[in-house]
Regions:
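Acidic/histidine-rich helix-loop elements
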Residues: 114-129, 151, 230-264
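Active-site metal-binding loops of divalent metal-dependent hydrolases
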Residues: 117, 149, 226, 291-292
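Hydrophobic alpha-helical segments, chiefly the membrane-spanning helices
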Residues: 370-376
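Conserved small/polar residues in nucleotide/adenosyl-binding loops
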Residues: 359-368
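Membrane-embedded alpha-helical segments of integral membrane proteins
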Residues: 12-64
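Structured beta-strand-rich core segments of catalytic domains in phosphoester-bond hydrolases
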Residues: 76-107, 123-125, 133-137, 143-239, ...
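Active site of divalent-metal-dependent phosphoester/diester hydrolases
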Residues: 36-45, 169-186, 258-287, 292-354
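Transmembrane alpha-helices and immediately adjacent membrane-cytoplasm interface residues
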Residues: 53-55, 60-93
Length: 376
């Protein structure tokens, strides 16, 4: 029995070292292009789970009062950059609640919302759209960025614009002939002066930018819906094969899932590189919003953010930030980033059915672009 416990002890040390090594590698996934490092995006994708398992390992070694506790702790703290993107003080304040109450539209405050509305549930009555409009009205949002906007034949553009009439300025780009894009839209209380649709090769996803005049100053707003992961669809295929108890078909389905994920990692990387270039070329203070379909550990997040943008959650957020309602609320894939000229006052993600972020900041004035709010 003593030999068994000794073997278990050494295996535990080995597993802790392997786990820590993989987790430390995850700290570099944000700088590793999917083209050059095929497996790094997968490590970055699994980083939330890896960190939790390392935390459990640290607790285990602490209880056993062994020096090996430093192995998982080193792995955890090597990923402080990621942790800082999902945790902000005060930690116990829920990230789903605002800390700054905005009771009325205020000239000195700008609140921006990004919301993946999933086609408003494809309802013919427009109930979801009207409900979202009421929610945004209650939160005093100034600018709305929608992904997967979706227009129904029975509740068309005119009906949508009527439901969202509190935001009289809008940009709803149409898909070019022969293409079917996952539609984006921007609605604003402030005048939209210029706009442009960004189309990506071999993708149904897209981005847009528009120049908005706020209190006499221009800001450039990017609304993004980067390459969809298609995890849910491929996961259903894998589950179907597993239910049929056919190991070969299940293996093929798993490989197909991995190949599909990697291809989408590559597409998002190309899209992120383009957004980074466009942000660098912006002549105005910039807000970058939307559904990146990527974690803060990813190449996509680090590339879009670059050295010119700040994360609204890091400048104005609190608690534990997640935006994906599945996978036990572990994942943050939606963002609002901003130029240093803007300063976040609040950043929160309401606990609604679909991903929504709000960012609140002081609005840019004629000679003052120092701060800017966000709701997430």
């Amino acid at each position: 029995m003593k030999a068994f416990y000794r073997l278990f002890y050494y295996i535990s040390i080995l597993l802790s070292c392997i786990l820590a090594g993989v987790t430390i590698a995850g700290a570099f996934s944000g700088t590793a292009s999917p083209d050059s490092f095929k497996f790094m995006p997968f490590i970055g994708l699994g980083l939330p789970i890896l960190l939790l398992v390392n935390l459990a390992s640290a607790v285990y070694w602490t209880i056993r009062w062994r020096c090996w506790v430093f192995i998982p702790l080193i792995a955890i703290f090597s990923n402080w950059g990621y942790i800082n993107c999902v945790l902000q003080f005060p930690l116990l304040d829920p990230a789903s609640k605002p800390t700054v109450k905005v009771n009325a539209y205020t000239p000195g405050v700008l609140t921006v919302a990004t919301y993946n509305v999933d086609g408003f549930n494809r309802e013919h009555t427009g109930y979801s759209c009207k409900e979202i409009a009421a929610q945004m009205r209650n939160l005093k949002a100034d600018i709305l960025c929608f992904q997967e906007f979706g227009i129904d034949d029975e509740f068309g553009v005119d009906s949508l614009c009527t439901a969202l009439s509190d935001w009289p300025y809008h940009y709803i780009p149409s898909s070019p002939e022969g293409q079917h894009l996952l539609q984006l839209a921007v609605f604003s209380r402030y005048s939209i002066k210029k706009e442009h649709l960004i189309i990506y090769p071999n993708s149904g996803n897209c981005s847009l930018w528009c120049d908005i005049e706020v209190n006499g100053r221009m800001i450039r707003l990017f609304n993004n819906h980067l390459q969809t992961t298609e995890v849910s669809r491929n996961k259903r295929k894998l589950e179907k094969e597993l239910r049929q108890d056919n190991s070969q078909r299940a293996k093929r389905a798993a490989l197909t899932l991995a190949d599909g994920l990697h291809e989408n990692f590559r597409k998002r990387a190309v899209q992120a590189n383009l957004i980074n270039q466009l942000v660098s070329a912006s002549p105005y203070p910039t807000l970058v919003c939307g559904d990146f379909n990527s974690l803060p550990s990813s190449y996509v997040y680090h590339t879009v953010k670059g050295d010119k943008l700040l994360d609204g959650f890091q400048t104005g957020g609190h608690g534990y930030m997640y935006t994906f309602k599945y996978f036990k609320h572990l994942l943050r894939i939606d963002y609002i980033l901003h130029s240093p000229e803007l300063k976040g006052l609040d950043y929160f993600s309401p606990d609604w059915e679909y991903s929504c972020l709000l960012y609140t900041s002081p609005s840019p004035r004629d000679k003052d672009v120092s701060r800017m709010p966000s709701s997430a």
